[in-house]
A protein has these predicted regions:
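A glycine-rich helix N-cap at a beta->alpha junction
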Residues: 77-94
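Conserved phosphate-binding/catalytic loop of the ribokinase/pfkB sugar-kinase fold
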Residues: 90, 101-146
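Conserved phosphate-binding/catalytic region of the ribokinase-like
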Residues: 1-7, 33, 159, 176, ...
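Conserved beta-alpha-beta core of the PfkB/ribokinase-like small-molecule kinase fold
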Residues: 136-213, 231-232
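Alpha-helix C-terminal capping segments
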Residues: 49-58, 103-104, 267-271
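A short, aliphatic-rich alpha-helical micro-motif
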Residues: 2, 130-132, 186
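Hydrophobic beta-strand scaffold residues
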Residues: 59, 85, 167-168
Length: 315
């Protein structure tokens, strides 16, 4: 049956304020100069959905913003990229979730985060739109979705599976305690896509394959662990695939994991084979690292395919 949307992306939507390069914070009330400053829509849902939209698939955003000027920027930016924002809630008396990122010369990104609207987000019982009318349903931001984390997220993913969606998932801010809200989700996740660091923190294991097996044993169908400059590890009951990273000039790693998620989502929509899917997700992730912000680097689908087939693999 034809679906209205290629993908629904539900979860953490954040306004990012990024500056680079920041070698130090000025002492007292002093001033330092930087070369670049940007505002972007980011977060484990926001960064992913904008990249999906840039890659040409139809998108429905589901999340929450506050009732401030930051909310206006988030919604207008999503709509500029072609995201359907009918699934958004505007919450009275709450600030929009936002992050200040000071990007170091080596691409590291220490952050100051205002939790805000995402702490209060719950999809209303009566939706303005069918959020499950999609091919791929992505839940992004577990760990920073105070009201959504836990049984509500389990019910959302169960319903997505019941409705015939492919389910994909990612988180943010993992701790050992996060496993208590993540483990009940595992049987309802088709593609589990955290970073190796986050996955390791939650399960207490260190070897990538052991980590992936832990989550497969928990019920995940396909485990994809992103490993930064080392590429990614894919594991399911039939295949183990290590995909190397591309050789790129890193400017800022903000949103690279979100871009990997977007690449996998688009690859699933396009019905690519798993090896090509992983390679495509790797190039989308790598391209984002070449500029400032979670929406940098990616131009369109064809450009990503060209770069996937022409860029050198990191040695």
């Amino acid at each position: 049956m034809q679906k209205k949307y290629d993908t629904t992306v539900l979860g953490l939507y954040v306004l990012d304020i990024l500056g680079r390069p920041v070698s130090k914070i000025p002492e007292g009330g002093n001033l330092e100069y930087i070369d670049e400053l940007r505002l972007t829509v980011a977060g484990t849902a926001g960064g992913t959905i904008i990249d999906c939209a840039k890659l040409g698939v139809s998108t429905l955003g589901v999340g929450a913003v506050g009732d401030d000027e930051k909310a206006d920027f988030v919604i207008s930016t999503l709509e500029k990229f072609g995201v359907d924002t009918i699934g958004f809630e505007r919450l009275k008396g709450v600030p929009t979730s936002s992050t200040i990122l000071n990007i170091r010369p080596n691409g590291e990104r220490p952050a100051l985060h205002l939790r805000g609207s995402c702490d209060y987000f719950l999809p209303p019982e009566k939706q303005k739109v069918d959020i499950y009318d999609c091919k791929v349903f992505h839940l992004g931001g577990t760990g920073l979705l105070k009201k959504l984390d836990g049984p509500v997220s389990v019910d959302i993913l169960k319903e997505a599976k019941k409705r015939g969606c492919i389910t994909t998932w990612d988180l943010i801010g993992a701790t050992q305690e996060t496993s208590s809200i993540v483990n009940p989700l595992l049987p309802h996740i088709d593609y589990f896509m955290p970073s190796i660091e986050e996955a390791s923190i939650m399960c207490g294991l260190e070897e990538p394959e052991d980590i992936a097996k832990y989550y497969l044993d928990g019920g995940v169908k396909n485990c994809v662990l992103t490993m930064g400059g080392e590429g990614s590890l894919f594991l399911n009951k039939d295949n183990k695939i290590i995909t190397p990273a591309f050789d790129i000039n890193v400017v800022d790693t903000t949103g690279c994991g979100d871009a990997f998620d977007a690449g996998m989502i688009v690859a699933l929509i396009k019905e690519m084979d798993i090896e090509t899917s992983l390679k495509f997700a790797t190039i989308t992730s790598g391209l984002v690292a070449t500029g400032l912000g979670s929406d940098a680097g990616i131009k369109n689908y064809d450009d990503c395919i060209d770069k996937m087939n022409s860029f050198k693999i990191k040695s």
